[in-house]
Swiss-Prot record:
Keywords: ATP-binding, Carbohydrate metabolism, Glycogen biosynthesis, Glycogen metabolism, Nucleotide-binding, Nucleotidyltransferase, Transferase. It holds the Pfam family NTP_transferase. GO terms for molecular function: ATP binding; glucose-1-phosphate adenylyltransferase activity. It catalyses: alpha-D-glucose 1-phosphate + ATP + H(+) = ADP-alpha-D-glucose + diphosphate. Its EC number is 2.7.7.27. This is Glucose-1-phosphate adenylyltransferase. It comes from Desulfitobacterium hafniense (strain DSM 10664 / DCB-2). The keyword Manganese does not apply. InterPro entries: ADP-Glc_PPase, ADP_Glu_pyroP_CS, GlgC_bac, GlmU/GlgC-like_hexapep, NTP_transferase_dom, Nucleotide-diphossugar_trans, Trimer_LpxA-like_sf. HAMAP family: GlgC (MF_00624). Pathway: Glycan biosynthesis; glycogen biosynthesis. GO terms for biological process: glycogen biosynthetic process.
Amino acid sequence: MRKKECIAMLLAGGQGSRLGCLTRNIPKPAVSFAGKYRIIDFSLSNCSNSNIDTVGVLTQYKPFALNTYINMGSAWDLNCLNGGIHILPPFVGEAQGSWYKGTANAIYQNMDFINFYNPEYILILSGDHIYQMDYYEMLSCHKQKHAEVTLSAIAVPWEEASRFGVMVTDAGGRIIRFEEKPPRPESNLASMGVYIFNWDVLKEALLEDERDPQSDHDFGKNVLPRLLQQGRRLYSYLFHGYWRDVGTIESYYNANMEVLQEERVDKFFELKQRVFSNEEILAPQHLGERAKIHNSLIGNGCTILGEVRDSVIASGVYVGEGSLIEQSILLPNSEIYEDVRLHKTILGENAIVRAHCRIGDKREGNPPQEGITVIGDHLHIPEGTVISEGENVRKDTA
């Protein structure tokens, strides 16, 4: 038994079905973001920068790419001997074991791992948000208020509040009510999916939840409301920084485009600590004689022979002569051949678009700013193909 004050459990097994074909072969935390990162980089970097050196990463859906990317955790300085990073897939033991049935059940199935370190506090994280937070400051607040559970919270627009777990607090920040994704929210204070529990409180709550046959075994739906009913001390930790939930195609696209906006980019990059990634070491970008770049982010290892405008281009991408890329996101190692027009499109990893294609063509009658075209990873789009805006292409086109 190795005593740790606080360890982190990072939930990274979600399929991310709302991201469509972007998560056909990989889980949501492994999806590329802003040209050089994976979504999970932000939570792992937060742990490293907050001196939390023991992290359990709970994987489930198609985990190979994520496991390979994380490796031993050295990119985030989490390859230490006493602690470090641990990949925790579902397993079958003598008395228990199955696929994770919910966020709470995922932690329940790994109680032996937690008990090995015998922590006083447990930090529960989601691996699919873009933000930077000092978890140590949150833990200090948790201690000062003698809280049993602390939830990080952020004010969101009222029209978006129903997408989140929302809380009502008193003047001191103590949570009075909590409801997961209410149809008519009474607050716009949203849970960020970052929790600190006293381990003894969480252990008891998980055991009780597992005994309930009616439970969905979910923190937001079951565990937190039950703790409130029991009169436990739940507090909010108000976060004022940059935070984005990128769980839908629209939110993922918009968050990437924000990196290019002058009024947003300063806030995104005013990070107090570095965001680490396990990015492959590649040569610098190569720009051809006729290449034109305007307000775009170009990753390492790219070859750009055409024109790129208002776009995020990840590492290892090829754009051929005479091609025009506008308001698009090209994920790692994708290829665009000659004379291609790509508009407001997300092109998956290792996808290939042959010459003379027109992708994201405007449909008559659609309002402006609608219709993000998505091409799945490893797909081949034949020469001369026309794909209208808003289509979600999951398999090779004939």
